[in-house]
Design a protein with these regions (language model features):
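Short beta-strand/loop motif that positions the catalytic acidic residue
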Residues: 222-223, 228-231, 235
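Conserved alpha/beta-hydrolase
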Residues: 97-117
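Hydrolase active-site cap/lid region
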Residues: 161-223, 266-271
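Alpha/beta-hydrolase active-site loop
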Residues: 120-140
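An N-terminal hydrophobic leader/cap segment in hydrolases
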Residues: 23-56, 64, 291
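The serine-hydrolase catalytic nucleophile loop
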Residues: 84-97, 110
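Conserved alpha/beta-hydrolase "acid-adjacent" motif
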Residues: 236-242
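Alpha/beta-hydrolase fold nucleophile elbow
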Residues: 142-153
Length: 296
């Protein structure tokens, strides 16, 4: 009898899970975006100077972010586009080291995140990234010939679209992409497949997700901006096959580093990996030399 009761309960649970996921995919924005409005205390900020920055998007949304300032004259300016959860107050941990290495770092929260207005949507977040690039090129004191873009996870996917479509592309000197998925529909299909009751339906369900902004469609248009793709080989959130796929689709100049033992957005915890990124940025922002090589 106990087994019968369990099976009877399992059916509505499975049905409920299906309904919830279908609703999430049908409104795919809620499936990809998990913002937090609250800023969290972060001791990492004690070692770097910062100030608030505000960006107005073409549709009138005011975005909030930070500028991290290095000591002395900046080596260049890096726009950082973060992942799908929380806000700049936590994601800043991923880029403080760049400010300490001498770069001005601009972090902007997408709409609905942190102190930014509005609600996160697929179209809105990608528009926000384009507006953030515009704002960097409009900032006083920024050397417009020494600008790079760095995106992590969702931010990597967004960065590929934004750089490919920015009117400033001819002046963007480098793009670094860490732990990005190759397509919105593809990653949705993989995640649906991890739910046993929906595994057989992963392909039709994933079609509810738009592929309009998928990086696999846009990465070929990033050129001639040099692109460095970084991915951990222990990434269980976005498997490294996504990074390899993006590298295969990218045009020269391009570089790839699959980092042994690194999980999702953990590659930059390695001093050796930071050094490689700094070499890439120094080369791209100073000599503008094409680097079409793959790192081991």
């Amino acid at each position: 009898m106990a087994g019968t009761r369990t099976s009877r309960r399992a059916v509505p649970v499975a049905v409920l899970a299906s309904i919830v996921l279908i609703a999430a995919l049908a409104g795919c924005d809620s499936y990809f975006f998990y913002p937090s409005k609250d800023h969290f205390p972060n001791p990492a900020l004690d070692c770097v100077a910062r100030e608030d920055v505000f960006v107005r998007t073409p549709d009138g949304v005011r975005l909030h972010g930070w500028v991290l300032r290095p000591k002395g004259e900046p080596l260049g300016t890096i726009l950082f586009l973060h992942g799908n959860a929380e806000n700049v107050s936590t994601h800043v941990n991923s880029v403080v080291w760049l400010a300490l290495a001498g770069y001005r770092v601009v972090l902007v929260d997408y709409r609905g995140y942190g102190k930014s207005e509005g609600k996160a949507t697929m179209a809105g977040v990608h528009a926000d990234a384009l507006a953030a690039i515009d704002s960097v090129f409009a900032m006083d004191g920024v050397d417009k010939d020494r600008v790079a873009v760095l995106g992590q996870s969702l931010g990597g996917a967004v960065a590929i679209y934004a750089v490919a479509n920015s009117p400033h592309k001819d002046r963007i000197r480098a793009l670094v992409v860490d732990s990005a998925f190759s397509g919105y529909r593809e990653i949705a299909r993989e995640k649906v497949g991890e739910i046993s009751v929906l595994k057989l339906f992963r392909s039709p369900l994933s079609r509810l997700v738009t592929d309009r902004y998928s990086p696999s469609l846009w990465i070929g248009r990033v050129a001639p901006v040099p692109i460095f793709i970084v991915h951990g080989d222990a990434d269980r959130v976005v498997p490294p096959a996504h990074g390899e796929r993006l590298y295969a689709l990218a045009a020269e100049p391009k570089m790839l580093c699959i980092v042994p033992g690194a999980g999702h957005i953990q590659a930059f915890a390695s001093p050796a990996m930071r050094a490689r990124v700094l070499r890439f940025l120094a080369d791209a922002l100073s000599t503008k030399r094409h680097l079409g090589t793959e790192l081991p």
